[in-house]
A protein has these predicted regions:
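Active-site and donor-binding regions of nucleotide-sugar-utilizing enzymes
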Residues: 7-10, 16-27, 53, 65-175
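Structural beta-sheet core signal
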Residues: 8, 38-40, 121, 182
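A nucleotide-sugar donor-handling region in carbohydrate enzymes
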Residues: 44-48, 146-217
Length: 217
């Protein structure tokens, strides 16, 4: 079976956590069908902290690190755009997966859309209705460059509808006929995963001998 290659772009630490849920699902259920390439832009990157994040979340370290670091919005976005374009040309993924509303999000959306690679936006449709916020510009622009939009809330669906997105899919998904899906919050998947992990690994009840008699917290 030929694997489809997707390229996931992350930059901020919250994006690592969100991307982990999808990465684990791919590894567990779709490893023969999907190859995931992980790119860290370096927007928020500390070698020690990030290494702990990836280890604790149970996902591999990034295949690429652009090491962009901090700077102005324009400087960071331009550096990411240049680095991502080179990686996309090399890897030629079937799709690029982005999360949220950071500079990494908008840079990846721009890089992919301009060379006609479909963009998959997870956490699409969210709005603060304050365009003075850089994140609001990022999330609006990213949505309008995406082919598949995965929306966590019903309010997000309403926001996209007001911006002209169609909810009835009559054609194959493409950038000028995107498909919108109400999928729920990906952080809930992480909550379920770590709740189960905690139940399996925690020994605090035994260590404190709380299993000897009933107790109340």
């Amino acid at each position: 079976m030929t694997q489809k290659k997707i390229l996931t772009v992350i930059g901020a630490r919250p994006q690592i956590i969100k991307a982990a849920a999808l990465s684990r699902a791919i590894q567990t259920h779709f490893s023969e069908q999907i190859e995931e390439i992980l790119v860290h832009t370096g927007q928020h990157y500390d070698e020690n902290m990030s290494a702990v994040f990836f280890e604790e979340l149970g996902i591999p370290k990034p295949d690429y690190n652009l090491a962009v670091g901090s700077g102005s919005h324009g400087h960071m976005t331009a550096a990411m755009l240049s680095g991502l374009e080179a990686i996309l040309e090399k890897e030629k993924p079937a799709a690029v997966v982005i999360y949220g509303d950071t500079n990494s999000t908008i840079a990846a959306a721009l890089a992919a859309a301009k060379i006609h690679i479909p963009v998959v936006h997870i956490e699409a449709g969210l709005r603060s209705f304050n365009k003075a916020m850089p994140e609001e510009i990022n999330r609006i622009a990213a949505d309008h460059m995406s082919t598949l939009l995965f929306v966590p809330t019903q309010a997000g669906i309403g926001n996209l509808t007001k911006e002209g997105f169609e909810l009835v899919h009559q054609t194959k998904a493409r950038i000028d006929a995107p498909h919108v899906y109400h999928c729920g919050d990906i952080m809930y998947d992480n909550s379920l995963y770590f709740a189960q992990l905690s139940d399996q690994k925690s020994r605090i009840i035994t260590e404190l001998e709380l299993n000897q008699k009933p107790f109340v917290l």
